């Protein structure tokens, strides 16, 4: 897991090239203007999913992880809390090849981050994440880019 902000150019310069490609794409395109849904950048190897939703409470959300792709969550507007843990600390359910989706169950939270505009979170296959959690007392309407980078 890597947590940071897209505007910290010096710090981000040491990140893997595939992650830096996400930031370059975001800086060259106004992602706030993108319609919700999948946008192909480089075939199945590199694409972005633009999502928008209202944050909520933990009881209404679920744990997930992925095997084929790295997730790079980039907050465009609003704020969202994301709970994190390692997949070995949760009960792994049946992996769904289509959609690259590993559902997990459990109550354990190892750590949490709050994403605000410009913040990013990189999730690797071992990083279970529970998204769409409200960051404070009030729900927030968010728009976020989730880059999918294939693991080669």
Predicted regions and their residues:
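A short glycine-rich, His/Asp/Glu-containing loop-to-beta-strand
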Residues: 38-57, 68-77, 84
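Short beta-strand segments in beta-sandwich/barrel cores
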Residues: 79-82, 128
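Glycine- and acidic-residue-biased ligand/ion/polar-headgroup-sensing regions
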Residues: 68-70, 74-80, 88-89, 97-102
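A short hydrophobic beta-strand segment most commonly corresponding to one strand
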Residues: 72, 120-122, 139-152
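Short alpha-helix capping/helix-loop boundary micro-motifs
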Residues: 68, 105-110, 132
């Amino acid at each position: 897991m890597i947590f940071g902000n897209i505007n910290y150019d010096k710090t981000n310069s040491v990140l893997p090239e595939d992650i830096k490609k996400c930031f370059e794409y975001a800086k060259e395109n106004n992602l706030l203007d993108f319609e919700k849904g999948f946008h192909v950048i480089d075939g199945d190897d590199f694409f972005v999913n633009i999502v928008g939703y209202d944050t909520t409470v933990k009881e209404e959300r679920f744990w997930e992880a992925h095997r084929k792709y790295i997730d790079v969550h980039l907050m465009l507007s609003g704020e969202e809390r994301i709970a994190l843990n390692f997949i070995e600390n949760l009960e792994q359910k049946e992996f769904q090849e289509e959609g690259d989706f590993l559902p997990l169950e459990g109550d354990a939270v190892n750590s949490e981050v709050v994403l605000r505009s410009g913040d990013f979170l990189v999730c690797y296959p071992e990083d279970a994440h529970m998204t769409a959690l409200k960051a404070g007392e009030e729900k927030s309407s968010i728009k976020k880019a989730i880059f999918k980078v294939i693991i080669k």
